[in-house]
């Protein structure tokens, strides 16, 4: 019985890990795109995302929030750095 429980627990853990790894957490392909294009793509990939927009090189907090995606934009309104969750 203990062996069966261990096998079920391992399978459940493997399923959870596989599910987590499928979640997109960064968008390097959006660098140079417009803010609106970036927002649309991120929300398509991650409907749970809470998007924050910051000017390029601005300070941010270092608390970790898995659903938060910060988009840094340059003076032209284009994505300046890779948007990433966290």
Swiss-Prot record:
Site (Reactive bond): 62-63
Cell compartment(s), UniProt: Secreted
Cellular component annotations (GO), alphabetically ordered: extracellular region
Keyword Ribosomal protein: no
Chain coiled-coil ranges: none
Subunit structure: Monomer.
Stated family: Belongs to the protease inhibitor I13 (potato type I serine protease inhibitor) family.
Name under which the protein is recorded: Chymotrypsin inhibitor
């Amino acid at each position: 019985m203990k062996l069966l429980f261990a096998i079920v627990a391992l399978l459940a853990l493997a399923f959870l890990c596989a599910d987590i790894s499928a979640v997109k957490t960064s968008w390097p392909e959006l660098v140079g795109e417009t803010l609106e294009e970036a927002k649309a793509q991120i929300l398509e990939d991650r409907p749970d995302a809470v998007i924050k927009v910051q000017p390029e090189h601005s300070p941010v907090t270092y608390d970790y929030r898995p659903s938060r995606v910060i988009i840094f934009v340059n003076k032209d309104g284009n994505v300046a750095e890779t948007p990433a969750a966290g």
